[in-house]
């Protein structure tokens, strides 16, 4: 259903602000790289002409829609030189920053220039925020030069635990775009649900998308609500969502969990599992023992067939394969898996996982895709239920083109991955997990998160692609409960991803939220 607060966060940032005098400094979210206030104002007319370069028609249409939401009428023109708002592609504008832009409000017009359509789009988001700050349509004259601090500015939504639906996802994409976040990480499969249609394996959604009950209250409560839960996206719906995101310059990175967090898939096709036994899609949350039989070529082929359909759907250059929280018990107890390990000189279960991951990574590379996974894919010991013996690595090393999504373990492991030459995205759970309550991660803690570990050289810093914040869904059954945890903290992560460190100021940021 369409909830009444579909754009509540956008409104909180814009429409209910108090006008500032033109000569005063302006605080935006995220804060631009450079903002120069100039004397004078520009009064927007009731009807606004928008001129655009030929490659910017979709951006111009979106700008027109945004302005109409602010009760302005608009007319679109291709190449009109005297339009009130002018969108222009210019190869000489911030050529080193393809997401960068310049925005100038003069006494005559508003110009947004960039070397890319993405930069133009982000300039439009800044203009939206400025217009929202001045409901009397008297905009201060200014000049903004803006570009992101990090190339990866991500929000992850877990729908494997609770399905939210297309309308909610599109609303979240709108809010991400407004905050200049460019990556939607979509967690579509896990133990408790499979949410993506795979035509070659229809039971993945016929069986895997349904569970008969859900654990409530907290992990290990063993209290269940007794309510069936189901839902999945057809490939048609996914294509529509991808297009919606593309128009907002957001890349969607799908996550298909392997070799663990596989219970829903194994419930659908028991032969995928190491034990080849029938199970139900679990309603209990937490880490489960069922894992794919990575020693079976039929299972490996099935996983590649699944990924083939995923690749055909998602234009993303990056595919996330999960790889987290794999319990090794079934592999250690399986004669078939043990024989496979002996044949391939794999000494430990962690080596087996890295061996499997390398095979998937190489296969994805052959399809023009780059693999990403949670930092267990390096083979490091992250969990108390793992032994040092099981996680010892001798003969297998993760390929250097893999992206390591760092979420847990000793914080030094992030620096270690970078020193070993891997690109990383910092998603350290103590700072970025949106399902944690505000006592655990208050707004200020979220805001001050720095994804760059201390002690890196200049050359090593380039391996930090950026930051992601995660909305895990185990105990987030409703959109309302999700939104309470998501807003306003997502704005803090957005500013961390976009704004230069020198421009960040929590007091100003929090005051901006209060007065908007």
State where each predicted segment sits.
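Active-site neighborhood of glycoside hydrolase catalytic domains
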Residues: 265-270, 280-402, 407-416
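Contiguous, structured surface segment used for ligand recognition
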Residues: 23-150, 481, 497-516
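Conserved, mostly hydrophobic/aromatic
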Residues: 50, 116, 155, 176, ...
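Feature activates predominantly on carbohydrate-active enzymes
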Residues: 94-318, 334, 359, 468-473
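Flexible loop/turn segments at secondary-structure boundaries
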Residues: 58-59, 163-165, 191-197, 259-265, ...
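Bacterial Sec-dependent N-terminal signal peptides
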Residues: 1-25
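Flexible, acidic glycine-rich loops studded with aromatic residues
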Residues: 371-378, 383-516
